[in-house]
């Protein structure tokens, strides 16, 4: 099977940093917002949106040069793109590749949508805490008021 060279899309390789692949199509801008990108310190950020994927049909890809993501950032990304994978790149080579995994408990990343939840009172310094009910698509339940928060409501918090 020959590949038509004119139809290939080339995205420059990064020397060091992170590649987030298999992001749900058209969700990469949410990922950039979660990560606070672009910023003045990050040299290059490359975004490919709605590209063809054999695995998931359509996907987004984000490449971040000279930055490796921490666990909290990966947990946030898991809420938006639960099937994404993360590649750590050093000297142009992938040294670590992991699927993003939604933890069983999420603390402080999103807010409870129940206005009467104790976590939403200014005079109660309690961080929102959620138990993950479903991974694909993400659904969580508030630890305090037991409000179920569906994927759409989670995504709205990152818009």
Curated annotation (Swiss-Prot):
Family statement: Belongs to the PyrI family.
InterPro entries per UniProt: Asp_carbamoyltransf_reg_N, Asp_carbamoylTrfase_reg, Asp_carbamoyltrfase_reg_C, Asp_carbatrfase_reg_C_sf, Asp_carbatrfase_reg_N_sf
Name of the molecule in the record: Aspartate carbamoyltransferase regulatory chain
Binding site for Zn(2+): 112, 117, 142, 145
UniProt keyword annotations, A-Z: Metal-binding, Pyrimidine biosynthesis, Zinc
Species in which this protein is naturally found: Methanobrevibacter smithii (strain ATCC 35061 / DSM 861 / OCM 144 / PS)
Keyword Ubl conjugation: no
A molecular function GO annotation: metal ion binding
The protein's required cofactors: Zn(2+)
GO CC, any one term: aspartate carbamoyltransferase complex
Subunit (UniProt): Contains catalytic and regulatory chains.
GO biological process, one term: 'de novo' pyrimidine nucleobase biosynthetic process
Cofactor detail note: Binds 1 zinc ion per subunit.
Record's keyword annotation contains Membrane: no
Reported function: Involved in allosteric regulation of aspartate carbamoyltransferase.
Gene3D superfamilies for this protein: Aspartate carbamoyltransferase regulatory subunit, C-terminal domain (2.30.30.20), Aspartate carbamoyltransferase regulatory subunit, N-terminal domain (3.30.70.140)
Domain of life: Archaea
């Amino acid at each position: 099977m020959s590949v038509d060279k004119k139809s290939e899309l080339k995205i420059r390789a990064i020397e060091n940093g992170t590649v987030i692949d298999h992001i749900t199509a058209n969700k990469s801008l949410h990922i950039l917002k979660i990560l606070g990108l672009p910023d003045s310190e990050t040299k290059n950020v490359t975004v490919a949106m709605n590209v063809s994927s054999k695995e998931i049909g359509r996907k987004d890809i984000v490449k971040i040069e000279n930055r490796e993501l921490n666990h909290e950032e990966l947990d946030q990304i898991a809420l938006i793109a639960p099937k994404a994978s993360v590649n750590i790149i050093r000297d142009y080579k992938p040294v670590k590749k992991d699927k993003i995994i939604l933890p069983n408990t999420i603390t402080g990343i999103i807010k409870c949508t129940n206005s009467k939840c104790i976590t939403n009172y200014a005079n109660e310094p309690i961080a929102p805490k959620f138990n993950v009910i479903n991974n694909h698509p993400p659904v969580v339940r508030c630890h305090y008021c037991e409000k179920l928060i569906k994927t759409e409501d989670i995504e709205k918090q990152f818009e």
